[in-house]
Amino acid sequence: MKTQRDGPSLGRWSLVLLLLGLTMPLAITAQVLSYQEAVLRAVDGLNQRSLDANLYRLLNLDPRPTLDGDPDTPKPVSFTVKETVCPRTIQRSPEECDFKKDGLVKRCVGTVILNQARDSFDISCDKDERKVARLGGFLQKAREKIARGFKKIGQKINDFLGKLAPRTEA
């Protein structure tokens, strides 16, 4: 009676297992995302969680910090997204959408994991304070201009009333 060890199938299986073992590290390496790819996935996740009417698209990605080699370690990220013209309800990539004129800009910070199998991110976004600061400066200038106008009006009223006052002659 012939056993499997005696036949050529054991040699074939050994060869298959050896080749499979050699290709596994390549498959694991292929699952690591680049820094920008991880951020784009985070933007997609933000769009899915968003209650806003339109999609957001990556506007600016801050320079990549020095990263360690472990794709499972959370990496710090900071970037800016801007509202697009595409409604959130359509199935379209934000990269295919134009930015909305005067669209909302959000500043986002957090962490991403580069291991594609884990696909994890922890990002929070706030309205871009730089736009708000510019608006605050505009409002401050407008307030000062209005105050100067009221002061001039007050002075003219005072001058007018001064002319109406009865003059007493001595």
From Swiss-Prot:
Keywords: Antibiotic, Antimicrobial, Cleavage on pair of basic residues, Disulfide bond, Immunity, Innate immunity, Secreted, Signal. Residues 1-30 form the signal peptide. GO terms for molecular function: lipopolysaccharide binding. Residues 31-131 form a propeptide. Proteolytically cleaved by proteinase PRTN3 into antibacterial peptide LL-37. Proteolytically cleaved by cathepsin CTSG and neutrophil elastase ELANE. The keyword DNA-binding does not apply. InterPro entries: Cathelicidin-like, Cathelicidin_CS, Cathlecidin_C, Cystatin_sf. It comes from the Eukaryota. Disulfide bonds join 86-97, 108-125. Antimicrobial protein that is an integral component of the innate immune system. Binds to bacterial lipopolysaccharides (LPS). Acts via neutrophil N-formyl peptide receptors to enhance the release of CXCL2. Postsecretory processing generates multiple cathelicidin antimicrobial peptides with various lengths which act as a topical antimicrobial defense in sweat on skin. The unprocessed precursor form, cathelicidin antimicrobial peptide, inhibits the growth of Gram-negative E.coli and E.aerogenes with efficiencies comparable to that of the mature peptide LL-37 (in vitro). The cathelin-like domain (CLD), which is the propeptide part, does not seem to exhibit auto-inhibitory function, as it does not inhibit the antibacterial activity of antibacterial peptide LL-37. This is Cathelicidin antimicrobial peptide. The lineage of its organism: Eukaryota, Metazoa, Chordata, Craniata, Vertebrata. The gene is CAMP.
